[in-house]
């Protein structure tokens, strides 16, 4: 279906389904899913709440403590690293950052300091398995960037969702080669669109608009097309 819609980028659904625990997990329901997507030219990423190619449903089954960077950094780091290992050399858009337990805000005195450490650790993991490929983040994904001279390196994205925008406004910024993904709130409300200086980043920018059953008032597909054209 994605190819028929002329798309080549997917975030597998993060929510639990009605199938038995742990629910649908793109990466493990069929271990060949990632390779099949790569064979068809589909770039696999994960939602704003699921960094480094790991699914929320996977963490829920680990029994390795809370999803909390301050209290459980070792286990969370190991979980993320296993996602990078599993992705291998398949074309992947690695999600950076993290939110708190249950896709809520990080519960800490200074989330910005925590996320700075998260970024640092995630970049170290990516460098461990991909070397200097993470030094550039340009691609012809969706036909947006097609400069033949552009260095096509590892793809990384940080999604600026809900309270994360306040961290960004406070000065939190990932490396320049990381794509900034601006997004709505599931209900079609977006805080703002990228500015000119943001579009000049080597990692580029993106905009995510929701269309799904979680928020029934989300924009219809035809509205999304009009917004994309504009």
Regions found by a protein language model. Give the residues of each.
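Feature activates predominantly on carbohydrate-active enzymes
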Residues: 1-66, 88, 157-161, 172-188, ...
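Gly/Pro-rich turn-and-neighbor structural signature
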Residues: 23, 31, 39, 62-202
């Amino acid at each position: 279906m994605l190819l028929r819609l002329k798309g080549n980028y997917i975030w597998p659904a993060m929510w639990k389904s009605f199938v038995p625990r742990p629910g649908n997990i793109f990466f493990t329901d069929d271990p060949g899913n990632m390779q099949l997507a790569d064979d068809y030219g589909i770039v696999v990423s994960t939602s704003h709440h699921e960094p480094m190619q790991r699914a929320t449903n996977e963490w829920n089954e680990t029994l390795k403590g809370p999803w909390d960077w301050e209290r459980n950094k070792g286990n969370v780091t190991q979980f993320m690293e296993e996602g990078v290992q599993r992705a291998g050399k398949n074309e992947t858009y690695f999600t950076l950052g993290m939110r708190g337990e249950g896709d809520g805000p990080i519960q800490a005195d200074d989330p910005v300091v925590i996320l700075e450490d998260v970024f640092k650790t995630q970049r170290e993991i990516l460098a461990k398995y991909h070397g200097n490929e993470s030094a550039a983040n340009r691609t012809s994904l969706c036909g947006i960037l097609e400069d033949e001279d552009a260095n096509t390196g590892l793809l990384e994205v940080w999604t600026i969702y809900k309270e994360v925008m306040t961290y960004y406004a406070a000065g939190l910024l990932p490396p320049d080669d990381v794509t900034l993904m601006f997004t709505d709130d599931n209900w079609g409300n977006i805080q703002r669109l990228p500015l000119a200086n943001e579009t000049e980043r080597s990692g580029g920018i993106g905009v995510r608009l929701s269309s799904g059953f979680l928020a029934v008032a989300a924009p219809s597909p035809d509205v999304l097309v009009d917004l994309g054209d504009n």
